């Protein structure tokens, strides 16, 4: 006999499927529509940069700290980027205290890869003395509330925090504080596949019933900087190209809104 939770899950999945047949979603959005997006910057006074993103009911807080350290042996004239993501227990009953979960590590890698592969930060300008001293950039991502699509909210919050980051030169006697040298604004867009449909910004309910999720991080020139698939069901070649087109188009829209929001916050 099925448990009540399994029965509810089946009914919810059937409900979402039936809506999709009519080209509708649970919250009334179209398949290419994001939920309401809100950006706040400089929300942590002791951080070098910070931002909070609210995507629907999903909330993510990012703080950026810089400290000096030694470079890696194979990149002695480049700074270091370290990204951590924490699934706080207050964000969801599914998130428990303890060591980082595998999915948290995976999501941190997606955020980190998008920043690195797009060349978002000019890491050579983080070099203080070649082979001896560089700035290490710590990007700490905290999930405050999970209502779906944590990765996109995390990517957006991380970039917004970096774009408001000041390098604390004065602390090290290196002159005046300067803005972190940014070269690019990558945007991550996650699509969920349910049946034959692809939709951006899946809610928590949509994530629970989707067969596969695909996150695509793109740069301002439309090039793909990173891609991560989650879920057992494969995508056809046609679905993959459709997903890339949708992601690049949506990223351009989000990027424009973000730059406008950042300009207003200065």
UniProtKB/Swiss-Prot annotation:
Transmembrane segments: none annotated. It comes from the Archaea. GO terms for cellular component: cytoplasmic exosome (RNase complex). The keyword Cytoplasm applies. It holds the Pfam family RNase_PH. InterPro entries: ExoRNase_PH_dom1 (IPR001247), ExoRNase_PH_dom2 (IPR015847), ExoRNase_PH_dom2_sf (IPR036345), Exosome_comp_Rrp42_subfam (IPR050590), PNPase/RNase_PH_dom_sf (IPR027408), Ribosomal_Su5_D2-typ_SF (IPR020568), Rrp42_archaea (IPR020869). One of its GO terms (molecular function) is mRNA 3'-UTR AU-rich region binding. It is found in: Cytoplasm. The keyword Metal-binding does not apply. GO terms for biological process: rRNA catabolic process. Keywords: Cytoplasm, Exosome. PANTHER family: EXOSOME COMPLEX COMPONENT RRP42, EXOSOME COMPLEX EXONUCLEASE RIBOSOMAL RNA PROCESSING PROTEIN. Belongs to the RNase PH family. Rrp42 subfamily. Non-catalytic component of the exosome, which is a complex involved in RNA degradation. Contributes to the structuring of the Rrp41 active site. Component of the archaeal exosome complex. Forms a hexameric ring-like arrangement composed of 3 Rrp41-Rrp42 heterodimers. The hexameric ring associates with a trimer of Rrp4 and/or Csl4 subunits. This is Exosome complex component Rrp42.
